């Protein structure tokens, strides 16, 4: 017997979505995740959209489609896109040294290539430690402290994920665009993509509709 391709596709999608839901429920239980949002996009179309669990466990506030979640280091994706937009604008060369764009960095940092910052192969020391900003509570103090440390390895030698790389990229974006990082990303990405609920802030901000942050 022959079944129309559309019917087969619909059946396969339904089965895949069912497996995705089961996987998410299992992951939430195993990792003690109180709540999350899930979206699956296939060929530019949303094929699964789920709101699971609670935004606030104590008050039993459910996650909805309007619940806001902090995305933390996923923000690096926006920084990477912003840098590539500057490349397309002819403002940035990925193979250029850091010193071409920032003249106030240590001598040992000056030869690091932009693509090495993007790919976490710069060899630069980490500006964030287990207590937060390295060397002090303020950003200038943290930069002063980390700039006094030696390179961990030679640039391009190995991958080492850290915050220093993308902090420097953010400074380049600010310098070349002539506007705050947040405004550049909002205008060039969020506004273009139709993301009005995506914004910037820190962990001390009180944001209406935001999920409570929990740690295990």
Q: What is the predicted role of each segment?
A:
Residues 51-57, 109-216:
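Short, surface-exposed loop or secondary-structure junction motifs
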Residues 69-72, 159-161:
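Catalytic tyrosine of NAD(P)H-dependent dehydrogenase/reductases that use a Tyr as the general acid/base
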Residues 76:
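Short, conserved phosphate/pyrophosphate- and ester-handling motifs at nucleotide-, phospho-/glycolipid
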């Amino acid at each position: 017997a022959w079944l129309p391709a559309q019917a087969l596709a619909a059946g396969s999608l339904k089965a895949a979505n069912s497996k995705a839901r089961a996987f998410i429920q299992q992951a939430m239980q195993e990792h003690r995740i109180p709540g999350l949002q899930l979206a699956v996009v296939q060929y530019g179309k949303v094929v699964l959209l789920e709101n699971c669990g609670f935004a606030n466990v104590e008050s039993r506030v459910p996650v909805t489609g309007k619940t806001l979640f902090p995305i933390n280091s996923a923000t690096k994706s926006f920084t990477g896109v912003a840098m590539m937009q500057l490349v397309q604008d002819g403002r940035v060369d990925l193979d250029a040294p850091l010193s071409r764009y920032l003249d106030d960095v240590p001598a040992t940092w000056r030869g690091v290539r932009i693509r090495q910052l993007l790919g976490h192969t710069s060899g630069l020391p980490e500006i964030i430690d287990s207590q937060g900003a390295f060397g002090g509570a303020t950003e200038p103090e943290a930069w002063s402290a980390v700039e006094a440390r030696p390179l961990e390895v030679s640039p391009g030698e190995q991958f080492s994920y850290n915050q220093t790389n993308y902090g420097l990229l953010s400074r380049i974006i600010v310098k070349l665009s002539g506007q705050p990082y947040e405004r550049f990303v909002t205008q060039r990405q969020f506004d273009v993509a139709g993301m009005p609920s995506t914004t910037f802030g820190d962990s001390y901000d009180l944001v209406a509709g935001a999920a409570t942050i929990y740690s295990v």
